Amino acid sequence: MALSLQPQLLLLLSLLPQEVTSAPTGPQSLDAGLSLLKSFVATLDQAPQRSLSQSRFSAFLANISSSFQLGRMGEGPVGEPPPLQPPALRLHDFLVTLRGSPDWEPMLGLLGDVLALLGQEQTPRDFLVHQAGVLGGLVEALLGALVPGGPPAPTRPPCTRDGPSDCVLAADWLPSLMLLLEGTRWQALVQLQPSVDPTNATGLDGREPAPHFLQGLLGLLTPAGELGSEEALWGGLLRTVGAPLYAAFQEGLLRVTHSLQDEVFSIMGQPEPDASGQCQGGNLQQLLLWGMRNNLSWDARALGFLSGSPPPPPALLHCLSRGVPLPRASQPAAHISPRQRRAISVEALCENHSGPEPPYSISNFSIYLLCQHIKPATPRPPPTTPRPPPTTPQPPPTTTQPIPDTTQPPPVTPRPPPTTPQPPPSTAVICQTAVWYAVSWAPGARGWLQACHDQFPDQFLDMICGNLSFSALSGPSRPLVKQLCAGLLPPPTSCPPGLIPVPLTPEIFWGCFLENETLWAERLCVEDSLQAVPPRNQAWVQHVCRGPTLDATDFPPCRVGPCGERCPDGGSFLLMVCANDTLYEALVPFWAWLAGQCRISRGGNDTCFLEGMLGPLLPSLPPLGPSPLCLAPGPFLLGMLSQLPRCQSSVPALAHPTRLHYLLRLLTFLLGPGTGGAETQGMLGQALLLSSLPDNCSFWDAFRPEGRRSVLRTVGEYLQREEPTPPGLDSSLSLGSGMSKMELLSCFSPVLWDLLQREKSVWALRTLVKAYLRMPPEDLQQLVLSAEMEAAQGFLTLMLRSWAKLKVQPSEEQAMGRLTALLLQRYPRLTSQLFIDMSPLIPFLAVPDLMRFPPSLLANDSVLAAIRDHSSGMKPEQKEALAKRLLAPELFGEVPDWPQELLWAALPLLPHLPLESFLQLSPHQIQALEDSWPVADLGPGHARHVLRSLVNQSMEDGEEQVLRLGSLACFLSPEELQSLVPLSDPMGPVEQGLLECAANGTLSPEGRVAYELLGVLRSSGGTVLSPRELRVWAPLFPQLGLRFLQELSETQLRAMLPALQGASVTPAQAVLLFGRLLPKHDLSLEELCSLHPLLPGLSPQTLQAIPKRVLVGACSCLGPELSRLSACQIAALLQTFRVKDGVKNMGAAGAGSAVCIPGQPTTWPDCLLPLLPLKLLQLDAAALLANRRLYRQLPWSEQQAQFLWKKMQVPTNLSLRNLQALGNLAGGMTCEFLQQISSMVDFLDVVHMLYQLPTGVRESLRACIWTELQRRMTMPEPELTTLGPELSELDTKLLLDLPIQLMDRLSNDSIMLVVEMVQGAPEQLLALTPLHQTALAERALKNLAPKETPISKEVLETLGPLVGFLGIESTRRIPLPILLSHLSQLQGFCLGETFATELGWLLLQEPVLGKPELWSQDEIEQAGRLVFTLSAEAISSIPREALGPETLERLLGKHQSWEQSRVGHLCGESQLAHKKAALVAGIVHPAAEGLQEPVPNCADIRGTFPAAWSATQISEMELSDFEDCLSLFAGDPGLGPEELRAAMGKAKQLWGPPRGFRPEQILQLGRLLIGLGERELQELTLVDWGVLSSLGQIDGWSSMQLRAVVSSFLRQSGRHVSHLDFIYLTALGYTVCGLRPEELQHISSWEFSQAALFLGSLHLPCSEEQLEVLAYLLVLPGGFGPVSNWGPEIFTEIGTIAAGIPDLALSALLRGQIQGLTPLAISVIPAPKFAVVFNPIQLSSLTRGQAVAVTPEQLAYLSPEQRRAVAWAQHEGKEIPEQLGRNSAWGLYDWFQASWALALPVSIFGHLL
């Protein structure tokens, strides 16, 4: 049949359970009632194209009429049990329940049409047309009653005859009908034969027997081929009945799922993280439940819950099969024969079971049937008291379920049986029924078997012992069956002593097996017997001998099934034989009983359909013979379902989910795959899965082993899912998803690890590891530490196995190291073998974690081999830590004694030995590794020591020697290169090798060797080189100057562009190249992006040539280069976008200055938003919220974040999730917002969130946080006596930022967390003030080493960067030998002034480096850049011979590299000009008095620095040498005025008078322009903002020079001061101070308020009067308004211009406004003014950064109270000057608080401005 039958099955299944539980209508029992519909449907299905024939319809009516006969049973075969009359329920009773119901009319109409159909007054087609809607509504009502949760409110019209198909029935008569059934004792008795004699009934075609009960359903499942014209009839039925049925079905499934979730959750529970973040791991079922509660869609089909296989009996049906237990005879002694035992009397057996006692069970029915033939005609009433339970204890079930209570409730008197005596049942039938109990769990089985054995031994031998398969023997009755059969079979002596005979008869089989239970192992499963088996059967026999090979861990122990063992995969003896045709045909001739066993599974037709379909579903069904299920299925099912109340009460917690699971699985089995489409199947699968979770056995019965992969796939897809942030402020969904993922990982990782161990899914492992790497460190730590040790170790092993496929990204390496370290903590002992096994993960470990391995680690050759294999991925600090372990004397002795084998094995670690140790290597040791050193990645000091032993300058073939040195040639001096192989060929092998050194950073582009290379290139000419050859010179490109570039063609320049991306092009070169390479028209986005390395060359001309539409889309490629732009270039970009609508010309003719109308809305590119001044940041709250996903990620400045926070008007009750959704915008949070957070927990969560922002926490907010925290902890201020427990939960970043006064209160563990963080990120330490750094270092030392004890080597290594901030006393506790071995580490640390001074003194002590007069080159190599810690006098004492050109260049280069590094830049060491001058004095000055000063060449300048030479020496340089070193002169900030004039004189010789300087030349001269006079400055062409900004960026002009620059620009441009716009004000830079105060007053306040962002970042050399005028511009209407109205963000925006605010306005500033001042603004306030405007309470409100910025000149003007206030702020309240006692200190604090109240009225004067 082409059309789907699934809607019909749903209809039938909805009727079946509903009728069973609600309406067995007397004579029209379930059998008869359903036979009507089933036969009718089967008739429709089998109908041919023509109309139904008269004969077929007559047969159908005969079947129907026989089904509706009241109170009559057909005569059964001779010997069958008599029919038993079920209780009657008349049709009248049913009609009574319909009175008053809205369904009265449609139900009567349905009944009438049914009668008309039966009377042939109506055709089936007409019947469907008239009653389709009523039938569909009836099905929906019955299904709604079946599914828990109640039907939804009807929204469709009521059903009527000929009405619409989409309708509903009220079904208000169902409850009344239920009550009626209960009142009429509706439980049916058992009937053992069909209502119609199958031998007399006629089929629809006149030949086949008529179906009974569900044979109509069998016809549906095996339909005829073609329907022909009746197909339309089926289609109509499907459309009318199926659609509403499926809709109701889906609604019911939804209700089931939702109601089950809470119920299953209450049963199973769910692991949740506790307060400490730890979570006790759940199991697989809890993981699946968690997923369904968190909207994960499990693939139920892949898990096995939609497999379509019949379900095994659940615990509920196991309970149904128990019934009332029977008393059993005591077991005889083992040696007594069964035939000698006393037989159990049937009369005695029936004495205790006079009638079936409800609720019924299979065993009760069987005993009842056995006793019927010996009873009198009128049986006595059954007893009214329950039978006691059996005295013999029952074997407990093997499931993990609780054992049900078998105590029966008081019985209810049933209907008496018929009074007419019936013939006794056939003994064969009765004893065939005993086969049920050979495999039954029912307690009555033992008594039944004994009785059948004693009364009918022949039938017992034939039915049980001869036909029951070996594998079916199971359960508690197995021992009794063995004993009973052993007594009936021939003596065991008939068992042959040798091999098992063929054929194997049942007698021989039972005799042999019962004689010895190990028959299979001892006789069949031996080598000789196996060889005797035919070859085609050997595999099967071997499988039987071995038994099923199941993984016990996959399926927890549950009950056994009818096959005697667990058969989840069909691997049992019986199923394997029946399913294998070859095996079946080979065994049946010898074992005849197999044919009976395999009838059902092999499709035999000698059993009823219902038994074949439902047999596996119900407990203890018989494998042979006719069963009650076939003879009378309706009463049988009613009898079982009548026991539901008792069995539900016995297991109340599992009754509902287990019952639903069974019904749902039965429904799935009957419907078949694909029912209702994918949506319905998914809902059904989820309901099935959910209902199986509480029952361990139901779950594992269905769960497939391959379902583990599906679980991993679903979890992996969920972890990879990125939840979109919903519109609006509430982003709780996406954040909730992140929290759910965290909960999943925290609570179910052990389950996932176990699944991964079994499935080996690399994709799932990679996904899981990625999720771990994204977890916060503290959450990851809690996860790993709360897992079982074995589970964590197994997961680490799994990672190691799949390491090659995990593909960790560079950004994830730190997190991977953290994860690896946590997993290592689960190992009780770290061994060398473990190190070798996990060697791929070693590069990710932090040094402390690496040092947890035993010290003897490196003594293992395999460990050294593992280090060699993975050294390329290891960090330098890791290699340094391991290299230091090589120096342990107990391992390998002293360095000069190390053998060659050790040196080769430890080669990757040798470059990381301390230099003082590496210098101990002898020339013989070095030469032994001659071929290995070039790849060893040596540092400069180590490389020079190796070169001294390897380079032989007397050899003739110097080029070969240099090539053999490889990378070591990078460290050769120019003199050595000149003696070995003079450089001459731009493309020669030596030259190319040196260029590679420059490319990887080993060779400095500013060094002397690089200068030699440049000379080769210049001498040969760049025009002769091809573009490819020219590209290799890109590392030296900045040193080529301008002239060389002008000689190159455009093709050569374009070819070099890709190579310039990693090079630092000078601004002058960028201007030149950008102008040459930028297309004059039709510029595309791709062309602009290709020029992005040249973006610092942006000029007015090039910017004008770039179309605005191209700039709009260029953020992706230009964004990373914006940080290299000057302030003026940024202003020009902003002005380009701002000028788009409403432009007005404010300038003179020909000099049109485009000025945007104030307040004009502008759309900015995303990358420019963080660069906008506040005046241009016109974003309203709606725009912010609409684009929150973008704005939350932008790196807003402090003042921008504060400004936008005010714009958003964030409510005070905003949740943490919504705050997190703001991202970097939350950095603008105000102190008032923090103070209004009531809960301490919420407060700490918000603080943690702020400290996780990449933009950091501004100083004012930080001060607010700690003040508020102390207040909340109810601690006395300013001194805390105790520390609350909340601080132990603070993040490590907060602990690092802890105020000084709280450091002493922290625990040792907290301090160590800070130390570890500082080691990993020293930049965060350098962001602290010097006082804070020293306090932290001293507190860490106090934790590591007791006071006044020497500091050990381990303590120094643990302190890391904190060593540089120790005080004098602590520094002197370092033993000098340990200090000597630690010098290489100190060279990479920032050193505080105190420590550096003390270190310089310690270096001169004898155990360290000794007196400087005795230093050699080795001592200088060891000291490195630490030589600058010496005094200038000590440096001058170093012998000139030790400071040769090569040594001096390397020493200065190392220090320059340090200064240019990120740590060096943040360190900001003091000026070292005098020390550098003392260091190079031996080269710069003549060797003896009276000798002429040397004239430097460019090589000498590169070997030292320009400022080391005097003006006379500079002026005497050769012009070519000066041109080659021009970039060095222009970039040296140490040149004095005389040296600048001398250098500028050389530049004028080179390029002519200043009036001819081109823009790129002016830019290249840089600071040298200060050497020009006022008249020469006026000759410069200063028309556009590009040239003007070149001068505006230079600091150091005199006042006359400033005036000359500004006046020249105004004159040449023809502009008036009032017409200066945003761009030109920014371009003026420092030179803005060249305008007189009266000129400054004419500047547009609107334009200046925008330029204030850039001008305020400069330390302007303006006078106090000029600063006041600039500040006045900002309070005008075009600016920011009155100072009193300014928020902290405006003070931060204007920077140093705030120093010009009048005294009265400054003195009226409030705490928040004062904290908005930048530290630079604090430092530039004139000292007298600073002392006047700020009182002590205002000074005490300074942040720590502001207080540290107070200059000594300002402190000198302060009063004692003011200085104490500054000290208070610097030390954050910890230290009060000693002359102020404790009481005075508190008095000062109280006075501070009171002074604020006095200061508030003063603020009103700010309105005067």
Curated annotation (Swiss-Prot):
Location relative to the cell: Cell surface; Cell projection, Kinocilium; Cell projection, Stereocilium
Pro residues: compositionally biased ranges: 378-399, 407-426
GO biological process per UniProt: auditory receptor cell stereocilium organization; detection of mechanical stimulus involved in sensory perception of sound; inner ear receptor cell stereocilium organization; protein localization; sensory perception of sound
Keyword Oxidoreductase among record annotations: no
InterPro entries noted in UniProt: Stereocilin-rel, Stereocilin_LRR
Tissues expressing the protein: Strongly expressed in the inner ear, detected in the testis, and barely detected in the eye. Detected in the six sensory areas of the inner ear by immunofluorescence. Expressed only in the sensory hair cells and associated with the stereocilia, the stiff microvilli forming the structure for mechanoreception of sound stimulation.
Predominant place of localization: other
Region listing for Disordered, in residue ranges: 376-426
Domain of life, source organism: Eukaryota
One GO term describing the cellular component: cell surface
Signal peptide: 1-22
Key words of the record: Cell projection, Cilium, Glycoprotein, Hearing, Signal
Glycosylation: residue positions: 63, 200, 295, 352, 364, 467, 516, 580, 605, 696, 860, 952, 1000, 1213, 1308
Lipid metabolism keyword on record: no
Its job: Essential to the formation of horizontal top connectors between outer hair cell stereocilia.
Family: Belongs to the stereocilin family.
Protein name per the record: Stereocilin
Lineage, opening ranks: Eukaryota, Metazoa, Chordata, Craniata, Vertebrata
